[in-house]
């Protein structure tokens, strides 16, 4: 383990207790660690002391990414892997009998996450020093470890093999031959050389050079540049999919599927359900033909029972079958993760049962499922539940014994908790927010519903408070952006519901307000209250106010636990002479996350880099990408999106210089409800919190800008705008003639917006003629008006799609529409109407170039940004 810190506070005791429990084979242990006490550090130390492989279970991808990043730093020389769901978008197949609606399966797989999953299983099979950070997706089925291992083969220099046999083995492992588009999971052949891009590697591939039927050389190279990076003596090639199946197993599975289909068809026909029988036979036989021909089919996971050789009701093969018996499982935020594991099975079972009942799938599809809680409990190795608020199951399994980690290494104590009446909670919150902002800290406000969050945000915005809201309608990348901007000080208050809880690291937060704290429920339970109170525990001046008209049991227990921890922490600090200090963490930590690789689409205004990184070549590359998006949107006739991207490009180019000096510059022109005078005061308040060095830097920047503007004003302007007297006075000669005169409004019709040489101001071909010009006083034939060279278009000529010359004289009458002779004399047949009709767009995907998946995603996402008034 690599770290600059040594265990402090309660950490040494907790590490010792947990290591003793592992040595004594205690199956379940509990680590009760408060927010900011270094639970991740303790887990890493336990792994180092026990020298065992470990699986870290996180409740969501955000915390999984955070843990992955931290363990990567703690163990740079070991195999730290990431195993989460690889779907960017997933719509499972389903049937709604009430409306007779069948929804096809639709998904989008993230290549980067898929590669990391392959890397995780490979590390488990090859190494002992493995740490896997996983989400709850690890209890879902993947390929059998026996089959996956059996399909693996090794090659080394000097081996003799047939080239055709090697290519056949690669195809059996579901590698694809790509002679041109050489990507992960593919291979190509060039004479006696075979190049393989393994499924678990990102920027390296292998070149197998053969002499006849003997392997002469194995080279590692960069697939992008072709540059050689190393020489290898042997390589082990793993399958391109966890669901790969050997041909004998596949043939046996096809026989079993046909047998089940035969029995199921007899059942449906006896019940008189002929439609379901016909549907099931058609769909299943198509899948069987695909399996026989290619070894795979769409929805192959529904036949996983036969492909893995399991019996009905057996647990599916999961990541837990790859984990060695001596491994440790750390369940992070166990009060959330454990109920998640228990809740995955039933919803999945109900959906698949409906599909089987109505003939869309065979009944065996219900064996493609996540683990039941009982199966997971029986399968898990030695476990440590880590939480500030352990649940009932964890405490029951550990016999009520737990390792406590209440003392923080920084000496911070839990924030004081105060109860105030809820009748005037909003006005009281506004006053507290102003005091907190004046001290330079941020505020978190938690409410009960999305509507309350948005309404409270609007009200605070009207009161002159810089505020945002965050709830489940906000896109995940937008949430990261909001948290980063809150820490930067771009706004002062964040209103949320259930997202302001586990794992939220905001050391700048000095005040947490919990509105309607007496409304009993899962949002105001003892666990939720303690977790929310913990958000203010990273700041030495943090405080929490519960707004309630009565003290509920959950509030009483939460305050009692918080006070117990405060007393213990204060005693420790007094005994050891520790002065508490706020937690310091880099703002970029929240963005340096593998979690961002789990997204492929984001709104154009969402930036995953910090402001300082969006400069120079990075900004240029970003602008180039946005310009490509703009052109693509225009090509797809989505002109509104193209215009938004164009405006964003323009704004970024204008901000390039200012962002490099001031990270808050992009909020300088943000809409504000207060007047200009108050706005100036508010900006002064922001500047007040800057250090002397920052204020000096901004002063020099302002002086440089002022000097540049003065120099620009001193230079002669060849293209200056003419003054009013120059534009309206007849015959007036300006003191300084510009090279180009601005035409009048009357002369600025279509096709007339051309500049006029300054020397011919009075001879303008586009200006309205004065009285002297009409009598030819300046040039031309005396007494005759001067005719312009270009005629001004009339209204008829300026209409849309009227570029032809208007017809002189009488316009011919419109001919009668042609009627079909078959319909002559019949009143029920209407003549065809040749008049222009509006273009009616069909639904997405019908006779058009639009992507139905994109259309559904646009309908599903409300596109909220957390800003008031949007």
From Swiss-Prot:
CC terms in the record's Gene Ontology section: cytoplasm; excinuclease repair complex
One Pfam short name: Helicase_C
Localization: Cytoplasm
Domain-related comment: The beta-hairpin motif is involved in DNA binding.
HAMAP family for the chain: UvrB
Function per UniProt: The UvrABC repair system catalyzes the recognition and processing of DNA lesions. A damage recognition complex composed of 2 UvrA and 2 UvrB subunits scans DNA for abnormalities. Upon binding of the UvrA(2)B(2) complex to a putative damaged site, the DNA wraps around one UvrB monomer. DNA wrap is dependent on ATP binding by UvrB and probably causes local melting of the DNA helix, facilitating insertion of UvrB beta-hairpin between the DNA strands. Then UvrB probes one DNA strand for the presence of a lesion.
Protein name: UvrABC system protein B
């Amino acid at each position: 383990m690599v770290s600059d810190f040594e265990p402090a506070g309660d950490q040494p005791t907790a590490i010792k207790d947990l290591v003793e429990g592992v040595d004594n084979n205690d199956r379940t242990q509990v680590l009760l660690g408060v927010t900011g006490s270094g639970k991740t550090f303790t887990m890493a130390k336990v792994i180092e002391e026990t020298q065992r492989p470990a699986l870290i279970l996180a409740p969501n991808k955000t915390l999984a990414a955070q843990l992955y990043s931290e363990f990567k730093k703690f163990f740079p020389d070991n195999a730290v892997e990431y195993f989460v769901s690889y779907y960017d978008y997933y719509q499972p197949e389903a049937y709604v009998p009430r409306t007779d609606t069948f929804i096809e399966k639709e998904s989008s797989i993230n290549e980067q996450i898929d590669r990391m999953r392959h890397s995780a299983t490979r590390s488990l099979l090859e190494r002992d020093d493995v740490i896997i950070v996983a989400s709850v997706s690890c209890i879902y089925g993947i390929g059998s470890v026996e089959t996956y291992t059996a399909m693996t083969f090794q090659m080394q220099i000097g081996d003799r093999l047939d080239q055709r046999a090697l290519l056949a083995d690669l195809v059996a492992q579901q590698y694809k031959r790509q002679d041109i588009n050489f990507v992960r999971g593919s291979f190509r052949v060039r004479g006696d050389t075979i190049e393989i891009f393994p499924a678990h590697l990102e920027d390296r591939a292998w070149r197998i050079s053969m002499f006849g039927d003997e392997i002469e050389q194995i080279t590692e190279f960069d697939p992008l540049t072709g540059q050689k990076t190393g020489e290898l003596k042997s390589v082990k090639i793993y399958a391109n999919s966890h669901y790969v199946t050997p041909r004998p197993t596949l043939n046996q599975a096809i026989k079993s599927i046909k047998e089940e289909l035969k029995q199921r068809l007899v059942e449906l026909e006896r019940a008189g359900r002929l439609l379901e029988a016909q549907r099931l036979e058609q769909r299943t036989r198509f899948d069987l033909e695909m399996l026989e021909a290619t070894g795979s089919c769409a929805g192959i996971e529904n036949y996983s029972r036969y492909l893995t050789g399991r019996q009905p009701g057996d647990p599916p093969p999961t990541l837990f079958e790859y984990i060695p018996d001596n491994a440790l499982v750390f369940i992070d935020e166990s009060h959330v993760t454990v109920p998640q594991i228990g809740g995955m099975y039933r919803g999945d079972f109900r959906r698949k049962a409906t599909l089987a009942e109505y003939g869309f799938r065979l009944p065996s599809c219900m064996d493609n499922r996540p683990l039941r809680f009982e199966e997971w409990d029986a399968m898990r190795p030695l476990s440590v539940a880590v939480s500030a608020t352990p649940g009932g199951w964890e405490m029951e399994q550990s016999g009520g014994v737990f390792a406590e980690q209440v003392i923080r290494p920084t000496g911070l104590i839990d924030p004081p908790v105060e109860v105030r009446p809820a009748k005037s909670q909003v006005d009281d919150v506004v006053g507290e927010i102003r005091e907190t902002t004046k001290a330079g800290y941020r505020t978190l406000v938690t409410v009960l519903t999305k509507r309350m969050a948005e309404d409270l945000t609007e009200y605070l915005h009207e009161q002159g408070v810089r505020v945002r809201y965050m709830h489940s309608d906000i896109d995940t990348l937008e949430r990261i952006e909001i948290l980063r901007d809150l820490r930067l000080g771009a706004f002062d208050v964040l209103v949320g519901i259930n997202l302001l809880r586990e794992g939220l690291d905001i050391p700048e937060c000095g005040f947490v307000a919990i509105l309607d704290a007496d409304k009993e429920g899962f949002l105001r339970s003892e666990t939720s209250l303690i977790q929310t109170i913990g958000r203010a525990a990273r700041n030495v001046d943090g405080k929490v106010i519960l707004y309630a008209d009565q003290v509920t049991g959950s509030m009483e227990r939460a305050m009692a636990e918080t006070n117990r921890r405060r007393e213990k922490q204060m005693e420790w600090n007094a005994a050891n002479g520790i002065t508490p200090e706020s937690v310091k963490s880099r703002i970029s930590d929240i963005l340096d996350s593998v979690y961002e690789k789990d997204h492929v689409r984001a709104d154009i205004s969402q930036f995953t880099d910090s402001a300082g990184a969006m400069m120079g070549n990075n900004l240029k590359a970003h602008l180039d990408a946005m310009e490509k998006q703009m052109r693509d949107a225009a090509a797809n006739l989505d002109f509104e999106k193209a215009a938004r991207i164009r405006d964003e490009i323009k704004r970024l180019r204008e901000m390039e210089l200012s962002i490099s000096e001031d990270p808050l510059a992009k909020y300088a022109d943000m809409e504000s409800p207060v007047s200009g005078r108050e706005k100036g005061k508010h900006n002064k308040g922001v500047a007040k919190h800057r250090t002397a060095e920052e204020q000096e830097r901004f002063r020099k920047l302002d002086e440089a800008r002022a000097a540049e503007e003065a120099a620009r004003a001193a230079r002669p302007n060849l293209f200056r705008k003419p003054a009013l007297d120059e534009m309206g006075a007849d015959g007036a000669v300006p003191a300084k003639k510009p090279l180009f005169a601005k035409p009048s409004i009357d002369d600025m019709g279509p096709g007339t917006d051309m500049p006029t040489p300054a020397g011919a101001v009075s001879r303008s071909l586009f200006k309205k003629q004065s009285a002297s010009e009409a009598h030819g006083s300046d040039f031309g034939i005396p007494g005759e008006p001067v005719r312009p060279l270009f005629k001004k278009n009339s209204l008829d000529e300026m209409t849309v799609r009227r570029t032809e010359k208007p017809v002189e004289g009488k316009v011919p009458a419109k001919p009668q529409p042609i009627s079909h002779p078959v319909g002559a004399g019949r009143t029920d047949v209407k003549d065809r109407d040749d008049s222009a009709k509006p273009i009616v767009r069909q639904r997405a995907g019908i006779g058009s170039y639009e992507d139905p998946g994109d259309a559904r995603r646009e309908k599903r996402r409300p596109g909220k940004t957390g800003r008031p008034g949007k």
